[in-house]
Design a protein with these regions (language model features):
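Long, well-ordered alpha-helical segments
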Residues: 24-31, 67-73, 106-116, 142-163
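A short, Trp-centered hydrophobic/proline-enriched beta-strand micro-motif
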Residues: 39-47, 91
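A structural signal for short hydrophobic beta-strand segments in well-ordered beta-sheet cores
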Residues: 63-64
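A short core secondary-structure module
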Residues: 73-123
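Glycine-rich beta->alpha junctions and the first turn(s) of the following alpha-helix
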Residues: 122-170
Length: 170
């Protein structure tokens, strides 16, 4: 017998670690992998969007580079455990002129942990829980980003347009 809630926590850490291990810069690996492995940082995967399901080629959440930050705007859905997560692996479209999977990039987006009363205390983030049947150990959320800032250095691998490829390597 297993407990899906425990498994879902491990899956989030595995996805983030695999992304960073396979596609991260040496600096990103040094910063994040030890913290994920020790449990000091709890990551979550932020990929799925409303009305697109798992069709990542239709992804619309945008990240625009402004100086030393990416400003993220858009909506995500069915995100598991985002409230208490410290780090989001956030798939965004950085080049709207590229069709389909091209132009997608992965950001390593730190955020403060939320609470039941204030799930998303970070500026530029809001959202709400999706009520589900059955999964008592997992909480699913919708998230809205409005100019949510991520440091430019947190572009996974330091190269735009590699997000889908990086994700498929996990």
């Amino acid at each position: 017998r297993g407990y899906i809630g425990v498994g879902s926590l491990g899956t989030r850490s595995e996805i983030a670690a695999e992304l960073i291990l396979g596609g991260g810069t040496p600096e990103q690996k040094a910063e994040w992998l030890p913290q994920i492995a020790s449990g000091a940082v709890l990551p979550t995967a932020v990929f799925t969007e409303p009305n697109t399901g798992s069709d990542l080629g239709s992804l619309r959440t945008r990240a625009v580079r402004e100086g030393d930050v990416w400003k993220v705007s858009g909506n995500k859905t069915w995100i598991t455990h985002p409230v208490r997560a410290d780090l989001m692996t956030l798939l965004v479209r950085t080049d709207p002129n590229q069709p389909g999977y091209r132009g997608l990039s992965m950001l390593l987006a730190p955020k403060p942990r939320g609470t039941d009363a204030e799930p998303f205390p970070a500026e530029g983030m809001s959202g709400g829980e999706i009520e589900v049947l059955g999964y008592r150990g997992m909480k699913e959320y919708e998230i809205r980003f409005e100019d949510f800032e991520v440091k430019a250095e947190n572009l996974l691998g330091g190269v735009e347009g590699q997000g889908f490829k990086q994700l498929m390597q996990t």
